[in-house]
């Protein structure tokens, strides 16, 4: 853990916003061509079900996920999945604080940002109108489609939560169901509080699904226990549609202990 000090910005308007897009930056060492329309449609359809390509040109490709319908007061329409053309990746905006919380890629993160000069951006649109569980599974399926479409990519960066993964870790995982979103779309951050023995752990990424993120303020405990607890609680909240109400208890971090929420 770095001893570098960071000051919390309580007025951050640039961080993840509730219901914001699930934005994936696919990173490359060399430029890549966009796969042809037929290939993209077939691969995305294999992962998410019935798909219609409504846009394909030199700038982007757009796909309607016809089995995932976003409903609004004035109508309904399929969720849209967008894939942009390959463009330069300048690595801007990844400050020391963001880098410090990339726990899944600690040994490779600096090399990735140094060597990767190109990116493809993929994102969803209108998915915020879906139920949380459906939204999570759709985003996870869309990620797996991108991993198949771009076999030469080096890494994936998930803007909604600040996680960075080597491409091989995305392709080789054995996780199923909505826990795929927890793995790639939710980050658990860790902080030491200056001048005290207190520690703080929080989650980032649940708000993408309009679900609550978590925060733990503690001391005299192994932070790894708390990290695991946070991931387990996040998974439970997603799988069961946020069933925990204010004042209720959940299993605590320590054995035979309950925590009030």
Where are these regions (language model features)?
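N-terminal alpha-helical "arm" segments
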Residues: 1-47
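Internal, hydrophobic cores of structured domains that mediate oligomerization or house catalytic pockets
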Residues: 84-187
């Amino acid at each position: 853990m770095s001893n570098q000090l960071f000051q919390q910005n309580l007025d951050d308007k640039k961080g993840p916003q509730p219901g914001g897009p699930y934005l994936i930056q696919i990173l490359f060492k060399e430029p890549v061509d966009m796969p042809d329309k037929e290939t993209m449609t077939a691969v995305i359809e294999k992962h998410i079900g019935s798909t219609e390509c409504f846009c394909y040109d030199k700038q982007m490709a757009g796909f309607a996920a016809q089995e995932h319908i976003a409903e609004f007061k004035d109508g309904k329409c399929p969720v849209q999945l967008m894939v942009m053309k390959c463009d330069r990746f300048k690595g801007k905006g990844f400050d020391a604080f963001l880098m410090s919380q990339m726990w899944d890629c600690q040994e490779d993160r600096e090399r990735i940002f140094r060597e990767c000069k190109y990116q493809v951006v993929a994102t969803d649109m209108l998915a915020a109108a879906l139920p949380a569980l459906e939204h999570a599974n759709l985003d996870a399926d869309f990620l797996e489609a991108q991993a198949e479409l771009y076999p030469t990519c080096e890494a994936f960066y998930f803007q909604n939560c600040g996680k960075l993964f080597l491409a091989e870790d995305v392709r080789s995982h054995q996780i199923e169901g909505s826990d795929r979103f927890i793995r790639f779309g939710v980050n658990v951050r860790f902080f030491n509080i200056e001048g005290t023995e207190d520690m703080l752990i929080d989650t980032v990424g649940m708000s993408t699904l309009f679900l609550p993120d978590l925060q733990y303020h503690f001391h005299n405990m192994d932070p790894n226990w708390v990290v695991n607890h946070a991931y387990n609680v996040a998974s439970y909240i997603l799988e069961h549609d946020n069933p925990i109400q204010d004042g209720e208890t959940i299993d605590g971090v320590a054995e035979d202990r309950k925590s009030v929420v």
